[in-house]
Amino acid sequence: MKKTAIITDSTASIKPGEINGVYILPLQVIVDGEKSFRDGIEIDYDHVHKLLKENPHGLNISTSLPRQSDLLKIFEEIKTKYDRFIFLPLSKGLSGTYDMLVQLAKELSEQNKDKEFLVFETSDIAISLKWLVEDIKALVDKGCDNQTIKAKVESHKQNILSAVTLKNLVQMRKGGRISGLKKFITTLLRVKPIILFDKGVNTLGAKVFSFSQAVEKIFGFVKTKFGDNYKIKRIGFCYSFCKNYANEIKKIITDFIEHNKINFQNEIENAFITSVIIVHTGIDAFSISLLIDNK
């Protein structure tokens, strides 16, 4: 059986060392256009949250690709332990990380003929990317071949949907990670935009005035994509505000599921937001990610 390492990036809501055989490549946070910090290593969620809170009208902060040197360092440290290296980066619709890894994997393959390198386009991010990593890890541990792993990635992409409800579009506009902003003008401060993340890209889905309206809209997106009789396998909940608000919204989600008799039998999973992600969402935002059971 091939000894396999999985390499994902720091947007996947996985902490270094959390999953055996899974390695985290940090993206970068750029402050004031010049100071670069590696996500989860030199800067964290709390630091970025503080900066954003101190600058409510917008902050000169952005994100950037991982450093090539960080990937090469990871590879040098683990190359003698593994025969196969599987890369599961965030969606190429959000970042150039995938393209960078494709090129680096090609170079590494030419230099290491006895190793195998596979880079997959996940169309994913955050907690649902973590789910994919966990599923691929389970297949790897069973000794599954490349075709089985590829099929799982493709199946996962077809059965996920995420939506982010924002306080405003200040940071999202700065990041340029969304289409359709020209059609959206927030004339009322209480309007909360919902960003739909589907098929690897962000689009402006709707605008609402309350958390309960946001939850209703998000499950409406799910119904539109998957039909009336969908069954939810996993629900992930991420947030960038205080715990009291988080508990309030989580209860709204749970009550909505129960009231509408939605087919979901498990617990809603919480996940931390990395500094790279909060740079774009800003504070007082939350996301709901869903994995549909297609069996």
UniProtKB/Swiss-Prot annotation:
Record key words, sorted: Lipid-binding
Q: Does the keyword Glycosyltransferase apply?
A: no
Q: Give the signal peptide as a residue range, or say none if absent.
A: none
Q: Which residues form the DegV domain?
A: 4-292
Q: Which InterPro entries does UniProt cross-reference here?
A: DegV, DegV_C, DegV_domain_contain
Molecular function as annotated in GO:
lipid binding
Stored PROSITE patterns? DEGV (PS51482)
Task: Please give the superkingdom of this protein's source.
Answer: Bacteria
* Residues annotated for hexadecanoate binding in this entry: T63, S95
Q: Name one Pfam family in it.
A: DegV
Cell division recorded as keyword: no
Function comment: May bind long-chain fatty acids, such as palmitate, and may play a role in lipid transport or fatty acid metabolism.
Q: Which NCBIfam families match?
A: DegV (TIGR00762)
Protein name (database record): DegV domain-containing protein MG326
Show the taxonomic lineage.
Answer: Bacteria, Bacillati, Mycoplasmatota, Mycoplasmoidales, Mycoplasmoidaceae
